[in-house]
């Protein structure tokens, strides 16, 4: 082996989906929406994953489990989310930890998106496609997952309680149509539209 080759820092490799976006999706979107150049093409900016553990007020151990599971799924340490105000009906005090969140960007974002679409979504029970009505009007898409066990990183035998999560895909698209086409091109399995 050449010693100089070993010492040079390697450039970070692109995620498989990021390469696919640059080579295939960008030209398709430029053609479809008639952008003047490729820099105007909407991009996936970040993915935010949120787990709300309302029962953590009574059982703090549930929050620790949610933190551990979210770290396994994303490969990143989650932030603890605290309540903003006290609600007596839910026995909730202001500042009490009630959930956790992770925000993924760049390579980690593309790798999570790839795993979500190709490994996790097909494991959803009775899956017929993701709803295309969960866009927010500004080009962002949120999907609710009912069971964390759809992710292959979670061992079903070690899960004490089934919990869900919200996954938000934030894009630079200005309209829902552009975001829908972007996510579809990246492989998001939306329900087929009846024509």
Curated annotation (Swiss-Prot):
One of its GO terms (cellular component) is ribosome. It comes from the Bacteria. Keywords: Ribonucleoprotein, Ribosomal protein, RNA-binding, rRNA-binding, tRNA-binding. The keyword tRNA-binding applies. GO terms for molecular function: rRNA binding; structural constituent of ribosome; tRNA binding. GO terms for biological process: translation. NCBIfam families: PRK00010.1. PANTHER family: 60S RIBOSOMAL PROTEIN L11-RELATED. Part of the 50S ribosomal subunit; part of the 5S rRNA/L5/L18/L25 subcomplex. Contacts the 5S rRNA and the P site tRNA. Forms a bridge to the 30S subunit in the 70S ribosome. This is one of the proteins that bind and probably mediate the attachment of the 5S RNA into the large ribosomal subunit, where it forms part of the central protuberance. In the 70S ribosome it contacts protein S13 of the 30S subunit (bridge B1b), connecting the 2 subunits; this bridge is implicated in subunit movement. Contacts the P site tRNA; the 5S rRNA and some of its associated proteins might help stabilize positioning of ribosome-bound tRNAs. Belongs to the universal ribosomal protein uL5 family. This is Large ribosomal subunit protein uL5.
